[in-house]
């Protein structure tokens, strides 16, 4: 039986933080023992958190005292999960890594550091070896590993089996992203009610950059950010759903490609987490539906087992002999954030990168 690992969750009262708490409360060997928060230090977690997810605050953590983000108080912590906001996260994560802590970050601050892995466990698990380079280059015993933008994961996971099996030449993506992607309290109601809000060229470019990096690592053993064989573009929007990012992708190929073969490649797709039977790995990373009006955010965002860990793909269509269309749905705060972070931690444990400090 695997020994228990102690986890700290930074920003434990935020929208992603509460998903970490929920998913780790009954995890077989990673336990949330240190809940860090700003403005609520010293108070019981269950009393101060706005529990904006399924179920109730787990009894295992309800009476835990919220603590400051102070490495001196975390001596016995094995893993740090960091869903801190952009800008604030980077210096804090570096401080912890320098002190020997193992940091899994959902923040963008280190996603494009050349020695920092940006991991989707089913897609590019081999990039964990960058940790060795990171430790050597930065002369620290800890590490920082990042998870990609939730939107990038919603596209990259279904694109991976296509990229592995067919000669892609281009992808055009349009997204409709839920409110929780903007954090709490989020967007002003008068900006989003009765509206679809374009996220702008900066967010579009960030999405493309991350998908490009992820796919560039599918076929290569060395990380080459920005290098790929396909042309990518994304147009991103915020809509008034709470959880779940909806994405429409048009994929073009260098030769005639049958949509039925593409569907089969998605249905059969599995990765290392499934082979290793990691606790948070869904049996199917991609669930393909042939129902005409699916996926739908309301019905499908919690797909998979554990719930919310599968990407649902539907509405596959042969547009012309060299173009197919599909729609994907990802639970942005589960698979796209906390669940992806927990699965990454499990992979790192299995690979020997996380053990007693």
UniProtKB/Swiss-Prot annotation:
It is an enzyme of class 1 (oxidoreductase). GO terms for biological process: methionine biosynthetic process; threonine biosynthetic process. Optimum temperature is 85 degrees Celsius. NADP(+) binds at residues 13-16, 180-181, 332-333. Its EC number is 1.2.1.75. Optimum pH is 7.8, with half-maximal activities at pH 6.5 and 8.5. Pfam families: Semialdhyde_dh (PF01118), Semialdhyde_dhC (PF02774). InterPro entries: ASADH-related (IPR051823), Asp_semi-ald_DH_pep-lack (IPR005676), NAD(P)-bd_dom_sf (IPR036291), Semialdehyde_DH_NAD-bd (IPR000534), Semialdhyde_DH_dimer_dom (IPR012280). It catalyses: 3-oxopropanoate + NADP(+) + CoA = malonyl-CoA + NADPH + H(+). Gene3D superfamilies: Dihydrodipicolinate Reductase, domain 2, NAD(P)-binding Rossmann-like Domain. Keywords: NADP, Oxidoreductase. Catalyzes the reduction of malonyl-CoA to malonate semialdehyde, a key step in the 3-hydroxypropanoate and the 3-hydroxypropanoate/4-hydroxybutyrate cycles. Belongs to the aspartate-semialdehyde dehydrogenase family. Homotetramer. This is Malonyl CoA reductase (NADP).
């Amino acid at each position: 039986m695997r020994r228990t690992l102690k986890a700290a969750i930074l920003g434990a009262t935020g929208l992603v933080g509460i998903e970490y708490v929920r998913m780790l409360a009954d995890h077989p060997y990673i336990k949330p023992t240190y809940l860090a928060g700003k403005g609520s230090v010293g108070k019981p977690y269950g009393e101060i958190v706005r529990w904006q997810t399924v179920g109730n605050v787990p009894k295992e953590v309800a009476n835990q005292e919220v603590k400051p983000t102070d490495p001196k108080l975390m001596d016995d912590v094995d893993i740090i999960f960091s869903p801190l906001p952009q800008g604030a996260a980077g210096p804090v994560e570096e401080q912890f890594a320098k002190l020997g802590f193992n940091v899994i970050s959902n923040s963008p601050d280190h996603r494009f550091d050349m020695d920092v892995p940006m991991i989707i466990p089913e897609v590019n698990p081999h990039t964990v070896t960058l940790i060795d380079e990171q430790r050597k280059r930065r002369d620290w015993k800890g590490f920082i590993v990042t998870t990609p933008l939730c939107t990038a994961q919603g596209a990259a996971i279904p694109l991976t089996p296509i990229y592995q099996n067919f000669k892609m030449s281009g992808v055009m993506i349009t997204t409709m992203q839920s409110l929780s992607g903007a954090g709490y309290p989020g967007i002003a109601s008068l900006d989003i009610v009765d509206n679809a809000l374009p996220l702008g060229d900066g967010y579009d470019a960030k999405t493309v950059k991350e998908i490009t990096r992820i796919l560039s690592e599918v076929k290569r053993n060395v990380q080459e950010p920005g290098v790929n064989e396909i042309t990518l573009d994304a147009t991103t929007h915020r809509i008034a759903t709470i959880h779940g990012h909806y994405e429409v992708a048009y994929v073009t190929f260098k030769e005639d490609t049958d949509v039925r073969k593409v569907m089969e490649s998605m249905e059969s797709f599995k990765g290392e987490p499934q082979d290793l039977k990691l606790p948070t790995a869904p049996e199917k990373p991609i669930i393909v539906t042939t129902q005409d009006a699916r996926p739908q955010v309301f019905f499908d965002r919690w797909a998979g087992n554990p719930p919310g860990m599968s990407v649902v793909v539907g509405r596959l269509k042969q547009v012309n002999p060299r173009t197919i269309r599909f729609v994907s749905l990802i639970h942005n705060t589960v698979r796209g954030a906390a669940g992806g972070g927990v699965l990454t931690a499990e992979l790192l444990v299995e690979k020997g990168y996380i053990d007693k400090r």
